[in-house]
């Protein structure tokens, strides 16, 4: 666990995570992350687990450990189509591993509000959000080079480009998210 200037802690992924799918092939594999997080869970208000964009063992572990799921997605047809597959995985996790987990909402990232395709995909996603009973957040994260630069520099957007419009987008999203959590 690494402490940051921003007052939060992170456990960064590394190359060792690539082999985790094979390591997690034992009995009870879906509960490994939950067991690992349990000793420190009481020390945090929130634990955010950023999973790969696949629906493998790592993601199932995260869903088994979670109380809420946030779906970040780009405004692309394939990304949006993946939401229904993700919903099927969540339904399976609810049935077999974690009945209390729920999808809290869908967040659009790398969003360009001026592009026709972005608006069309958002309309499609709104229909999908009704199907999976999860709202689309009003806040969206605009496409910005600063996000990729921050990732390349292993920094968060607030430390890397705290006055950027994309940092403002993330602040607005955090505020919207927290209002929903504490409503």
Report each predicted region and the residues it spans:
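Conserved catalytic-core segment of NTP-binding enzymes
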Residues: 41-139
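P-loop/Walker-type NTP enzyme "switch/lid" segment
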Residues: 1-42, 150-152
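C-terminal alpha-helix
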Residues: 172-183
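C-terminal boundary of histidine-terminating zinc-finger modules
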Residues: 150-172
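Hydrophobic residues at beta-strand termini and immediately following loops
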Residues: 11, 139-141
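Charged catalytic carboxylate motif
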Residues: 32, 85, 169
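Short, glycine-rich, amphipathic interfacial segments at transmembrane boundaries or analogous
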Residues: 143-149
